[in-house]
From Swiss-Prot:
Protein name: Elongation factor G
GO molecular function: GTP binding; GTPase activity; translation elongation factor activity
Keyword Protein biosynthesis carried by entry: yes
Domain tr-type G residues, every copy: 8-282
A Pfam family recorded for this sequence: GTP_EFTU
Gene: fusA
Lineage: Bacteria, Bacillati, Cyanobacteriota, Cyanophyceae, Synechococcales
Disulfide bond residue pairs: none
UniProt record similarity statement: Belongs to the TRAFAC class translation factor GTPase superfamily. Classic translation factor GTPase family. EF-G/EF-2 subfamily.
Binding site for GTP: 17-24, 81-85, 135-138
Length: 691
């Protein structure tokens, strides 16, 4: 079966930004104008098509990256609407990995926010070409040129306006297209009756000025056009279009558009720009991967090339497990067998679907450049490569950040224990930043994630999707332990209980290991003073103790243990006895090696009106924070700091009350650092009291 759209007329794009910039509303309008939906859904009414999870509709935020297909001007556009909340960074990360282009949405009032910078960095990591839509031009305080300036200064982007707003705030009536040098005047509330006319006389000078800036910027980035521009001082409309597209594809240029998705102004022009300026799958470099022999190879975006795809999301679904894939090359047919080259297992493709949010359409095949979902995969998880069984390749996987917060979870009734286990396994399959473990001392199930909201949503999903009611403990910080000194440790386990006894004796030297080395073991036993078969159990005893910690029950990291001596008994020694002796020696050594507690430090960025700067800095200092920098821009203060995660619980509420609801902040993991002695003593005594 032939393709519906040739590859050059396919666009795989993401819509990304910080919270409340209007991403989901922009997506809704795109679907409305392109005919996918016939009624406009509002985020604040809980009716958005892409916010299809119950929690998203209640909270008015986008949690998971919903994939939708639509068409415009005879082009297929596959859209991923990504979340703006930092707890759901993995959703943005996995979207960026599989997209060809991005619309970055900014609020015309708020401008560049901390989360905007995180999203921009993620797009940089995967070299994704992008354009900007400055949204909410109807809002009080909207300032298009101020936001444009912030994009240039803070994001270091070579941005250039290709539009100007006609009016602003309540007076927004239209948009000037600087490429065509025409004005688009909106005559009705739905944004469908548009009059294209000459630029209004009172804006002619402004439009001419910015059109010249556009021509100069394009000429500087395009050798073919610079001579023409220097000779005539003018570029044609088609020159401008070609120059913008070339600049975007080469990452030299970021076109900036404007409008108000909520007021239905400017969205059709955004769709035109997606078609005109963002890349098709064949415009981006072919995907790279590794062959079984370790050599690098590429897969061109071509239906005739060997099949390769990346699984970028796994999702539980009433009909079975949905695995979202980005097709990079070849054709994937339903009923076929493929190789999961990451895990070296074969998988069968039961069914294939393309999605329109929570609506789906079954298809017989997916082709190079498509975004779709597969049913029937049993062993494939996020970041795995699927490829032809006779032509294996492993594609670059996703960057997954480590979780920083954990809570204990237990079912409200004993009978729900099995349901809870199934729910946790299913959720961990979907979300690589969600981890599940069993606490060795208490036997409790502990879940870990990227933040309070992240875990709250997952617990909510356990109830809604898996019908498991759970009791949740208070959020706990993922502390670590390490040592700062060196020493010897000895463990002797000897027990006589009538008949055969138990005997194991281990002596070790302990010292700090290299950063991020975890646990390292070296065997220096010579002359058979401890038989070889008891070395491994002794190491295992040390390793298990290392994982459960010594001073406060947290994993011990970056430690090097060398087994130097010991003794055994011909009759009474056993593997279990040496495992216990190894654990005893490890604990003995740690206590003499100046053990310390480490805590996760978070990079916290706060934006507040200038009037609140003093109280916010004072509050961060009281949370053991280190203020690293501050700047003031047009009445808005930005404070950068490093703060222990333990001090940040409930900060969102505190910041709202300190700034009368006008402050925002972003937080992401930075590094581990020693906990101050007085704080560490309190944590240690609390943990010893609980054990």
């Amino acid at each position: 079966m032939a393709r519906d759209f040739p590859l050059e007329r396919v666009r795989n794009i993401g819509i990304a930004a910080h919270i409340d910039a209007g991403k989901t509303t922009t997506t809704e309008r795109i679907l409305f104008y392109s005919g996918v939906v016939h009624k406009i859904g509002e985020v604040h009414d809980g009716a958005a098509v892409t916010d299809w999870m119950a929690q998203e509709r209640e909270r008015g935020i986008t949690i998971t990256a919903a994939a939708i297909s639509t068409s415009w001007n005879n082009h297929r556009i596959n859209i991923i609407d990504t979340p703006g909340h930092v707890d759901f960074t993995i959703e943005v990360e996995r979207s960026m990995r599989v997209l060809d282009g991005v619309i970055a949405v900014f609020c015309a009032v708020g401008g560049v926010q901390p989360q905007s910078e995180t999203v921009w960095r993620q797009a940089d990591r995967y070299s994704v070409p992008r354009m900007v839509f400055v949204n909410k031009m109807d809002r009080t305080g909207a300032d298009f040129l101020k936001v444009f300036g912030q994009i240039k200064d803070r994001l270091k982007a070579n941005a250039v306006p290709i539009q100007l707003p006609i009016g602003a705030e309540g007076e927004l009536s239209g948009i000037i297209d600087l490429v065509e040098n025409k004005a688009h005047i909106y005559k009705d509330d739905l944004g469908q009756d548009i009059e294209v006319t000459d630029v209004p006389a009172d804006m002619k000078d402004e439009a001419d000025k910015w059109r010249n800036v556009l021509m100069e910027t394009i000429a500087e980035n395009d050798e073919d056009l610079i001579e023409k521009f220097l000779e005539s001082g003018e570029l044609s409309n088609s020159d401008l279009k070609r120059g913008i597209r070339t600049g975007v594809l080469k990452h030299n240029l970021v076109p900036v558009l404007c409008g108000s998705a909520f007021k239905n102004k400017g969205v059709q022009l955004v769709l035109d720009a997606v078609v005109d300026y963002l890349p098709a799958p064949i415009d981006v470099p072919p995907i790279q991967g590794l062959l079984p022999n370790g050599k690098e190879a590429v897969r061109p975006s071509d239906d005739n090339a060997p099949f390769s795809a990346l699984a970028f999301k796994v999702m539980a679904d009433p009909y079975g497990k949905l695995t979202f894939v980005r097709m990079y090359s070849g054709v994937l047919e339903k009923g076929s067998y493929v190789l999961n080259s990451t895990k070296d297992t074969k998988e069968r493709i039961s069914r294939l679907v393309v999605l329109k949010a929570d609506d789906r359409e079954e298809v017989d095949a997916l082709r190079a450049g498509d975004l779709g979902a597969v049913l029937g995969l049993k062993n494939t998880t996020t970041g795995d490569t699927l490829c032809a069984t006779d032509d294996p390749i492993v594609l670059e996987t996703l960057f997954v950040p480590e979780p920083v917060i954990s809570v204990a979870v237990e079912p409200k009734t004993k009978g729900d224990m099995e349901k809870l286990s199934k729910a946790l396994v299913s959720l961990a399959e979907e979300d690589p930043t969600f981890r599940v473990r069993t606490d060795q001392e208490t036997g409790q199930t502990v879940i870990a994630g990227m933040g309070e909201l992240h875990l709250e949503i997952l617990v909510d999903r356990m109830l809604r999707e898996f019908k498991v009611e759970a009791n949740i403990g208070a959020p706990q910080v993922s502390y670590r332990e390490t040592i700062r000194g060196s020493s010897k440790g000895e463990g002797k386990f000897s027990r006589q209980t009538g008949g055969k006894g138990q005997y194991g004796h281990v002596v070790i030297e302990m010292e700090p290991g290299e950063p991020e080395s975890g646990f390292e073991f070296i065997n220096k036993i010579v002359g058979g003073i401890v038989p070889k078969e008891y070395i491994k159990p002794a190491e295992q005893g040390m390793k298990e103790t290392c994982e459960s910690g010594v001073i406060a029950g947290y994993p011990l990291i970056d430690v090097k243990c060398t087994m130097v001596d010991g003794s055994y008994h011909d009759v009474d020694s056993s593997e279990m006895a040496f495992k216990i002796a190894g654990s005893m020696a490890f604990k003995d050594a740690v206590k003499k090696c100046n053990p310390v507690l480490l805590e996760p430090m978070m990079k916290v960025e706060v934006e507040i009106p200038e009037d609140f700067l003093g109280s916010v800095i004072g509050d961060l200092s009281s949370r053991r924070g280190q203020v690293e920098g501050q700047s003031v821009d047009d009445g808005t203060s930005k404070v950068s700091s490093k703060v222990p995660l333990a001090e940040m619980f409930g900060y969102a509420t505190e910041l709202r009350s300190m700034t009368q609801g006008r402050g925002i902040f972003s937080m992401e993991f930075s590094h581990y650092e020693d906990v101050p002695r007085n704080v560490a003593e309190a944590i240690i005594s609390k943990n010893q009291g609980n054990s």
